[in-house]
Structures are given as structure tokens and as C-alpha cells.
């Protein structure tokens, strides 16, 4: 009769669920494991393996899901982005407020620069004694050009003087006065009607480009390749014209050069305007208000001078 008994106590590993009856093995029905008791579940002792499903693995956090504090890490160095990241990784109300204050500060400085330049151009255009003096003394032109070039390199290449008050405003004032003198002397060689006409055209073009840059979805800051090739083309074209000028003056070549220059700096105006906005691929740091005003001011001045070459009429 012992053969007919179930061998439970002495069964070998791996023979669970089997019975040995009259020398024959039969499958026993599977019995579900009993759930743990309340004490086992709460104390964690004696918990059977497989009693509960394993906990799901943690989902790795994507960097774009986490808030990054803009004050803790900035992706800018000397006013230019070091990569393809924006200055602000999140655009909260405070970030937008900082950007609006930055844009307001840039355009306030730009307005003062343009008013000073307009006053100098009007003085050199309408006052005959001043106009005759600056044309008779070209040395002041070259001195102003040297000051302009030195201050421009300092403001463009050195982040220290550009960001520290009051040196940034002093350098920008000297730069603006020297550039205003250069623009005024150039305007003195054209008649008053041409100067006024080019001023009006420049104002309309710059206003239209500024409004377009703020409204369009096209990102000019992602076109660095094109905006590098065009100035190189303009530079070599000007070099060829400078070589040909002592031998022969070709009016249509100068007209093409002036049109190309006006177009290139119009594109640069759109680029520099979008750099202020902060919602493009690249944007300026809010600390770079001097650099932003400097770039837009130069764009407007160069557009005006190229329009003078294109539409202006020399004085008789």
C-alpha cells in the first residue's frame, strides 16, 4: 500500500506536480501559490518569489522635459552662441520680460545714434562753410576712419570693455561720432535732394525689414553660409573696382556694386534684428545690448551710403 501513497516528503527537485501511483507517474493538477499573509506583506519577511509582479523600470528623463535654470548655465560666450542652443531653454514670463527690456534698451541706444548721425549729416549738407571746410581738409576723414576702426574692433572683439559700464558707453559714443563724421563728409559731396531722397528710402527699407523680421517665421540666423559668401563677394567686387578706378570709371559697374552692397546689408539688418528676439536658432545675450545696437547701426549706415552711390547725384 505504500506504493499507492503520494511521495510528498521525499520527492526529488523538479518532480513537483507529479504523482507515482502503482509505479506509474501521473501529472497532478497545478495548485496556485497561496497569497502572502498580512504580516508577511507588511514586514517583507518570508515573501515568496513571484508573489508580486516586478516593479517597472524607471523611464529615463529626456533633457527637454526638465526645466533648466537659465541663471545656472548660459550657452553664450562673448555674445555669441557656442552651439545650437538658445540662451533660454524655457520661455517663462520672466524670460520674455527680460528679452523685452533688452530689445527696448537696444532700440533706445540705436535711436540716439541715428539722431546724432542725422544731425551731423544735416550740418554737413546744409551749412556751406562746414561743407567747404571738411572737403578742404581730408585729413580729418582719415583720422575719423582710424578712430572708427579702432573702436569697432574693441567693441566687437573684446567682451570686457563692451559689457562694463561706463567704458561701453564711452567707446560707443566715440564710435558713433567718428561714424557720423564719415557719413556726413560723404553726404557733403551729393546735392541736398539726393541726400534727403536716400534718407527717406533708407528709413522705409529699414522699417519694412524690421517689421518683416519680427513677423516672419523664416530664420535668418540659420543662414550663416549664405551670409558669409555674400560679404566675400562684395569685398572682392570692391577690390576689383578699386583697381579699375585709376584707369577708367565704369558707371554701371559701380551701380551693380552699390545695389549688391545695399542688398547684402539689408539681409544683415534682418539677421541682426532676429538676433535680438531670442526665439530663433541663435540669439544675443541680454548683456550684449551694446553689441546689438552697434550691429544694427552699422547696417543702417551702410545701407544709406550704398543708396547714395546708387541714387545720389554729385554736386556741380
Curated annotation (Swiss-Prot):
This is Protein lifeguard 2. Glycans are attached at residue 191. Interacts with FAS/TNFRSF6 and BAX. GO terms for biological process: apoptotic process; cerebellar granular layer development; cerebellar Purkinje cell differentiation; cerebellar Purkinje cell layer development; cerebellum development; negative regulation of apoptotic signaling pathway; regulation of neuron apoptotic process. Belongs to the BI1 family. LFG subfamily. The chain crosses the membrane at residues 106-126, 138-158, 165-185, 194-214, 225-245, 250-270, 290-310. It comes from Pongo abelii. Keywords: Apoptosis, Cell membrane, Glycoprotein, Membrane, Postsynaptic cell membrane, Synapse, Transmembrane, Transmembrane helix.
